[in-house]
């Protein structure tokens, strides 16, 4: 689950990190009043969406007057912001962040992720702040400095000092950086984060460090024990189909192709998408129905897949391990009858009671195309999607 910038900065402030004075506003009038409370001559106004590239898309501006801030809010609130990280429809803007402008002398990068290889939280810092860190990692990896956090002892001050030295910080800036580093390390573990970024972490003209931006992603599997963060969830930023799928414990990710995929197991789902691509098709989604593929969940899965108008055919690829293929077949038949599926459906069953499941599908009288192998299934669904 992602947080908005203003929410990330609220958490930063709770852990004693320096953030600009700012206010999240729901209406143009609130933005006008917030601008009046900010003492700096210039005010920064930012659209709050779960996407990067806001500045280039016109979603971040600098204004001298309260009226200019209000006009910006009137322009964007209730509209969709399209950036290079969104689809063509963009994401809805329901809040505007109004905050004080800063005198920037230097921009740094500070972030942390869970590194699965080392099984550690790993901090990354760079002197190249304010730009795409992935580009820096690819072109000049030597500019990224890392510190792995031992889960038994947590972040250590000496690690923060080492990073500060490598970033060229001096004097009191080192103490400030260590405080930020320690706060972020504790926050990462306490709130079950998957990723956090401050890009840029700026050195102001006065010589102080300031968290100018904030990005936080929380491990969705840990949300059950993070009630405070659950309240920060903004469903308007999610794909409606993905939100619907989550209610049924279906793992769904919308893609741009024309072949709907329904599979049990994430690994098999990725393999299915790969082989569809290999045979010239384009998957319309990733959908893992999991081990408990009941009729109800299969029905909802069909509804979600078919809510995408680009879907021209559906591939159902089920491996019966714990779940029996004949029960899956009953679910598919019931779902197709209930939903009224009009596009071709290709089904490949393998494993526990697969012959019985295939027999049930064949005797159903429905327009279901059977396949005995994954290659055959991919070939048939690609042909069906092309109308062949």
UniProtKB/Swiss-Prot annotation:
Summarize where Mg(2+) binds, as residue positions: 199, 213
Annotated residues that bind ATP are located at 46, 53-55, 99, 102, 107
**Per the UniProt record, which EC number(s) apply here?**
6.2.1.5
Pathway entry:
Carbohydrate metabolism; tricarboxylic acid cycle; succinate from succinyl-CoA (ligase route): step 1/1
**For substrate, which residues are the binding ones?**
264, 321-323
Record domain ATP-grasp: where: 9-244
InterPro entries attached here? ATP-grasp, ATP-grasp_succ-CoA_synth-type, ATP_grasp_subdomain_1, Succ-CoA_synthase_bsu_CS, SUCC_ACL_C, Succ_CoA_ligase-like_bsu, Succinyl-CoA_synth-like
Keyword Hydrolase, does the record have it? no
One cellular component term (GO) for this entry is: cytosol
Reaction it catalyzes: succinate + ATP + CoA = succinyl-CoA + ADP + phosphate; GTP + succinate + CoA = succinyl-CoA + GDP + phosphate
What are the entry keywords?
Answer: ATP-binding, Ligase, Magnesium, Metal-binding, Nucleotide-binding, Tricarboxylic acid cycle
Name the GO terms of the biological process aspect.
succinyl-CoA metabolic process; tricarboxylic acid cycle
UniProt enzyme class: ligase
Q: Name one GO molecular function term.
A: succinate-CoA ligase (ADP-forming) activity
The record ties this protein, via Pfam families, to: ATP-grasp_2, Ligase_CoA
Function, as annotated: Succinyl-CoA synthetase functions in the citric acid cycle (TCA), coupling the hydrolysis of succinyl-CoA to the synthesis of either ATP or GTP and thus represents the only step of substrate-level phosphorylation in the TCA. The beta subunit provides nucleotide specificity of the enzyme and binds the substrate succinate, while the binding sites for coenzyme A and phosphate are found in the alpha subunit.
Provide the family line. Answer: Belongs to the succinate/malate CoA ligase beta subunit family.
Q: Which HAMAP family match?
A: Succ_CoA_beta
How it assembles, according to the record, is:
Heterotetramer of two alpha and two beta subunits.
Query: What name is this protein filed under?
Result: Succinate--CoA ligase [ADP-forming] subunit beta
What is the species of this protein?
Aliivibrio fischeri (strain ATCC 700601 / ES114)
Q: Which gene encodes it?
A: sucC
